[in-house]
Curated annotation (Swiss-Prot):
Span list, region G1: 14-21
Function comment: This protein promotes the GTP-dependent binding of aminoacyl-tRNA to the A-site of ribosomes during protein biosynthesis.
Designated gene of the protein: TEF-S
Segments of skewed composition (Basic and acidic residues): 189-206, 398-419
Protein name from the UniProt record: Elongation factor 1-alpha S
Organism: Porphyra purpurea
Pfam family, one: GTP_EFTU_D2
Chain residue ranges for the region called G2: 70-74
């Protein structure tokens, strides 16, 4: 028996109509993930509906509504293998109306493929476009390795009117590279002088010298014809870099926190005939095994036995971080739902959150103040959370401009009651704040230092991402009936002792999640 390949989850993101599903479907087909007969059937069905170019996209677009509209609404899972890895593909929607599903898919990914329409690149970066927002969300949700497929190269035009144009490819790369670096997709430029080099400080005036380069790998492709997907394209001899397949095979295997307690955010819950209730999701930390006792929060279900664990319709003895699995439990489909978190009942089980302290960077908003209540997307949860108490603010240059602890009148008080935040700090695009956030419905989040996949989030409002954040510490909710005692704060942060007195007043003790 050969060594089992490492599992990697790949999310395919990008603006609507960039060709994500076609590119992914063609790649899966080329790698033997689907047979020619099925592709021929898809082609016949597509022609009948007047959409003959959709045959590869339909490998993933399984819902009838998606086929008729020609856009991906749900997230679809498929798999293929490279020399080193076993890939699970998550094809995420590009349409703005379905960004919630895109976030759910991206929260489960290790690496991302950003598909760009080389022929109509401007639509994805214009106001209302999804290209940069998808890249930002991917990075915020923990995806640090990115491949960029400049798609539809068979259809682009250069100045002379021919397809496969190098000029257009360069134009897209020159614009997108710096934008991705601003988001965080960057690495040290190997061409820079190393620390300690005698020539390092030779020219102090040249402060514009690049010290970082974009860490994303760009590949010109055609999802329709298959150029540069597995084999080098004869249509683009000017491109000497790796194929898309080679880029995916060169990804670094993600670190898997198997030693940590179990955390598995639920993506969906199904009722399967002859089996029963099957929650599905990605193991973020720890190990899930058949026979273990698990807890679901904020559903309030504890000591539930895991009957069996399946991955890609095959029974497995256990699932480790990164695995997308379904597992059978003796509950009804109404007992648990998407956004609930599964953990080991006997080892630090998840606890619903009363409020949490976070550092939030404002991406696109003119005036955020106390009381603002947008939707937060954290792991698979999609819950409105109130900016209960903005505590401090830094400007675009990182200089601190406001801090509630500077209120000298409060500084002299030592009462134990939560204190009112009287500063009413306002924040706008480019600024960052420390803030106590309070969910309007029961949810589970964790401090980034303890469970990083459950400790980062995106803030969405008006159909766009307005901010991203990292959770510093969490005040768990005491779910015991009639409880008055506060549970210990989870997570460590220098800001905790400074700002703990400004926590929002707790919700009613023992309050269950709203269904």
């Amino acid at each position: 028996m050969g060594k089992e390949k490492t599992h990697i989850n790949l999310v395919v993101i990008g603006h609507v109509d960039a060709g994500k599903s076609t590119t992914t479907g063609h790649l899966i087909y080329k790698l033997g993930g689907i047979d020619a007969r099925t592709i021929a059937k898809f082609e016949a069905d597509a022609k009948e509906m007047g959409k003959s170019s959709f045959k590869y996209a339909w490998v993933l677009d399984k819902l009838k509504a998606e086929r008729e509209r020609g856009i991906t609404i749900d997230i679809a899972l498929w798999k293929f293998s490279t020399a080193k890895f076993e890939y699970t593909v998550i094809d995420a929607p590009g349409h703005r109306d379905f960004i919630k599903n895109m976030i759910t898919g991206t929260s489960q990914a290790d690496v991302a493929l950003l598909v760009i329409d080389g022929n109509n690149f401007e639509a994805g970066i214009a106001e209302g476009g999804s290209t940069k927002e998808h890249a930002l969300l991917a990075y915020t949700l923990g995806v640090k390795q990115l491949a960029v497929g400049i798609n539809k190269m068979d259809d682009v035009k250069d100045k002379d009117g021919g397809p496969w144009a190098q000029g257009r490819y360069n134009e897209v790369v020159d614009y997108l590279g710096p934008e991705l670096m601003k988001i965080g997709f960057k690495k040290k430029d190997k061409g820079d002088k190393k620390k300690g080099d005698k020539k390092e400080k030779k020219d102090k005036k040249d402060k514009g010298e690049k010290k970082y380069v974009c860490s994303a790998t760009f590949v010109p492709i055609s999802g329709w014809t298959g150029d540069n997907m597995l084999e080098k394209s004869t249509n683009m001899p000017w491109y000497t870099g790796p194929t898309l397949f080679e880029v995916l095979d060169a990804m670094k295997p993600p670190k898997r926190p198997t030693e940590d307690p179990l955390r598995l955010p639920l993506q969906d819950v199904y009722k399967i005939g002859g089996i029963g209730t099957v929650p599905v999701g990605r193991v973020e930390t720890g190990i899930l095994k058949a026979g273990m006792q698990v807890t679901f929060e904020p559903a309030g279900k504890a000591a539930v036995e895991v009957k069996s664990v399946e991955m890609h319709h095959t029974s497995v003895p256990q699932a480790i971080p990164g695995d997308n699995v379904g597992f059978n439990v003796k509950l009804t489909v109404k007992d648990i739902k998407r956004g609930d978190v599964c953990g080991d009942t006997k080892n630090d089980p998840p606890i619903p959150t009363e409020c949490f302290l976070a550092n939030v960077i404002i991406q696109d908003h003119k005036n955020i103040r106390n009381g603002y209540t947008p939707v937060l997307d954290c792991h698979t949860a999609h819950i409105a959370c109130k900016f209960a108490s903005i505590l401090s603010k830094k400007d675009k240059r990182g200089k601190q401009t406001h801090d509630v602890s500077d209120d000298t009148e409060w500084a002299t008080k030592d009462d134990a009651e939560p204190r009112n935040n009287r500063m009413n700090i306002a924040a706008k695009t480019g600024e960052s704040v420390n803030v106590w956030l309070q969910p309007t419905k029961a949810m589970v989040v964790e401090a980034y230092s303890m469970y990083s996949p459950l400790g980062r989030f995106a803030v969405r409002d008006m159909k766009k991402t307005v901010a991203v954040g990292v959770i510093q510490c969490v005040q768990p909710r005491n779910m015991a009936k009639g409880a008055t005692e506060e549970l210990p704060i989870r997570g460590e942060s220098d800001a905790v002792s400074k700002y703990i007195k400004f926590r929002p007043l707790p919700l009613k003790a023992g309050k269950k999640a709203k269904k």
